[in-house]
Amino acid sequence: MGKWVGNTPKYLYLFSENGVDVIIPVGLLSILKKYFNLAKYNYSINLSDDKKFKFNTNVELYDYQKIAVDSCVKKGYGILIAPTGSGKTQMGIALICNLGYKALWITHTTDLLNQSYDRASQYVDKKYLGKITGGKKQIGSGITFATIQTLANLDLLDLKNEFNAVIVDECHRLAGTPTKLKQFSKVVNSLAARHKYGLTATLHRSDGLEKTTMAYLGSVCFSIEENDVKDKIISATVFKINTGIKIDTCCLDIDGTINYNNLINYLAANEDRNKLILRYLLKDKQEYNLILSQRIEHLISVYNLLPDELKEKAVLLNSKMSKNSREQAILKMQAGEKNYMFATYSLAKEGLDIKRLNRLHLILPTKDKAVVQQSVGRIRRCDESDKKAIVYDYVDDFIKSQKDFKTRKSFYKNINCEVFD
């Protein structure tokens, strides 16, 4: 298409060479074994499985969770797919305890690391838990929690045989940008653990790199369906909000095709559109609203439209916030002190566990299945109230926007949402 791709490599290599050795992801083990057996090659598997650990705990599971965990234990490695709100972290902890091996739990954000650590501490004494983050390395005798960024900067030779089990949380992110892929490749291929698992709500990627994730961790060992958890999460209703905004010539290239960046900038800056969004925010000022956009500038514009008394009831998450400020903002939302949370899709994609949320505003278009379904999942978590989950999907008056909504509509249907359009 003649577009600049920056430093993006043409090919992504999943193997590396070290002298006469070829290092291949463990997820390909079953395929290699089949070919070796057919060719009658002699081979040995040198993976780490000598660090047994007795957790002496019982992680309570629903029937569907127990079936999933048992299947993963039997398979030995692979990917567990479970919808948002189904208890992925709970199942991951139970999986480690059932395996009975010293384990490493990998996340891509500190927030997610802390949430997973806190959940594990409900079942496993903290003296058996450790963290590798922020340059500090504390290895736990039971489970160690680490961010992928910190691990990638360590000398992993010291950790090669340290763990017999590895859990990669939100593993669909493993095959993200080339930089992220290099990080995950370095870390996952450097660990000799026999048991490697991935946890995710959806293996789908908009770039089609699902097979890359499976190459590192193995195929899907179990998939929990929406119907399996329908009694554990609340249903959501989706309302299509027609903005009436038509496409402008500033959004088009010379040849008449849509310039996506210009389109997003135009929609984000459109005063009439933002005032329509404000109207729905004011209507639900007593509810707990999650407002998502692709641009922080757009979120700021809508936030600034709120009356001063409602700005006091709003939090705006951004990547420049300190860890403490972000944690405090989330805690205030969890406690019901705030009614509005503004965030980009990327910031809200994973690790945002606020059961009180019951309204979702998708104020700029996206058709990424993982993003849409995870965003909806944020408002479907059960709490002690009799809450109703509502999604507002803002759709503009031009063909691309309507087509994108049609795509999202199919995603909503897949997770049993009722859609009014």
Kindly give the residue locations of the regions a language model identified:
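A short beta-strand element within the Helicase C-terminal
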Residues: F342-A343, L352-P365, I390-D393
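Conserved helix/coil segment N-terminal to the catalytic DExD/H
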Residues: G134-A165, G176-T177, L181-S185, L347
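Conserved pre-motif I regulatory segment
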Residues: G2, Y11-E17, K33-I81
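Conserved helicase ATPase core of P-loop NTP-dependent helicases/translocases
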Residues: N114, Y128-I139, L290, I300-S301, ...
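Conserved interdomain hinge at the start of the Helicase C-terminal
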Residues: D255-Q294, I300-L305
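Conserved SF2 helicase motif VI
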Residues: A82, L203, K367-V391
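Walker A/P-loop
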Residues: K74-L99, L104
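Post-DEXD/H (motif II) to motif III coupling segment of the RecA-like Helicase ATP-binding lobe
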Residues: N164, H172-K240, Y412
